Amino acid sequence: MASLRKTHPLLKIVNDALVDLPTPINISTWWNFGSLLGLCLIAQILTGLFLAMHYTADIATAFSSVAHICRDVNYGWLIRNFHANGASFFFICLYLHVGRGLYYGSYLYKETWNIGVVLLLLVMMTAFVGYVLPWGQMSFWGATVITNLLSAVPYVGNTLVQWIWGGFSVDNATLTRFFAFHFLFPFIIAAMVILHLLFLHETGSSNPTGISSNADKIPFHPYFTYKDLFGFVILLLALSVLALFSPNLLGDPDNFIPANPLVTPPHIKPEWYFLFAYAILRSIPNKLGGVLALLASILILMVVPLLHTSKQRGLMFRPLTQILFWTLVADVAILTWIGGMPVEHPFITVGQVASVLYFALFLIFIPATGWAENKALKWN
């Protein structure tokens, strides 16, 4: 008689995704980040749920309700620190996951990749509206500056901004709706994750070599379940160290000051994980141009599959493109640094050069090098 996990309608789905899934034997630790992202999402939903039980989405009490959570609620400080720093770890895993996809050619699974890019956008939106909730100075001014960018949309811009604000400035209506969005989005993300996995399991995972692994697969359980559990332990340990020893390391000191519409902070900047996109936005002197560049910096990932010129899938055997990939990584690091710097010489010029290089690598250098490598190997 067949096992229940293979016959029961619900358990069969879980079994095919987590137990009997044929998995390439040679996938490295870079393939761990998908499951780590799942762990981050679950952790964020759970901690967020407990925070929402004590938080009040009202400008008069939002800031003090967060202080109340940290001071008076049992382990409230712990839940808050895990939630705030969990977001940072979420983005670390996200960027590493995307980087792995770019390096090993995972983007050639187009449906999986495009849903992944949509997921990235959704997580970024969720993090943005979540950052507004404590109603500190950086929360308020971050919300004001970023939502104001929509006024650059021709013809309907100003109406659009007022519609999002629910008034003529960032006020109580804005905070209330941002809380509603911040509560809703993670569940939409969870649904999209299921779609992401559905499309992934249509094709199976790629592997570091970029060639078919159909001849050499092993069951997901126990091999990769234990490998993933090891990753979970490392992630939770690192998150615990950050949340318990230096919970405010990645935050902004300005956010300990309650929001004040009459006082502008000297340097308005988002959380570290948005700084690269913020640097690209700031490097263009025109408002609409900056907004379009900001969008393009993420949406460019959607055109990566269309710009794949090489006859090889990944970069494992392509040293020239490897150099360009690591140049891209360094470029994003430079943009992240520039995004946190004041708008003055020489940071403006460095930001503009790094922004041009960012798009040039995706659109020109990497496709051209792929073509050149084909020529060198006489594979054209």
Swiss-Prot record:
Belongs to the cytochrome b family. It comes from Neocyttus rhomboidalis. Heme b b562 binds at residues 83, 182. Heme 1 (or BL or b562) is low-potential and absorbs at about 562 nm, and heme 2 (or BH or b566) is high-potential and absorbs at about 566 nm. GO terms for molecular function: metal ion binding; ubiquinol-cytochrome-c reductase activity. It is a multi-pass membrane protein. It is found in: Mitochondrion inner membrane. A ubiquinone binds at residue 201. It comes from the Eukaryota. Its cofactor is heme b. This is Cytochrome b. GO terms for cellular component: mitochondrial inner membrane; respiratory chain complex III. The keyword Nucleotide-binding does not apply. The gene is mt-cyb. Heme b b566 binds at residues 97, 196. The keyword Heme applies. Component of the ubiquinol-cytochrome c reductase complex (complex III or cytochrome b-c1 complex) that is part of the mitochondrial respiratory chain. The b-c1 complex mediates electron transfer from ubiquinol to cytochrome c. Contributes to the generation of a proton gradient across the mitochondrial membrane that is then used for ATP synthesis. Binds 2 heme b groups non-covalently. Keywords: Electron transport, Heme, Iron, Membrane, Metal-binding, Mitochondrion, Mitochondrion inner membrane, Respiratory chain, Transmembrane, Transmembrane helix, Transport, Ubiquinone.
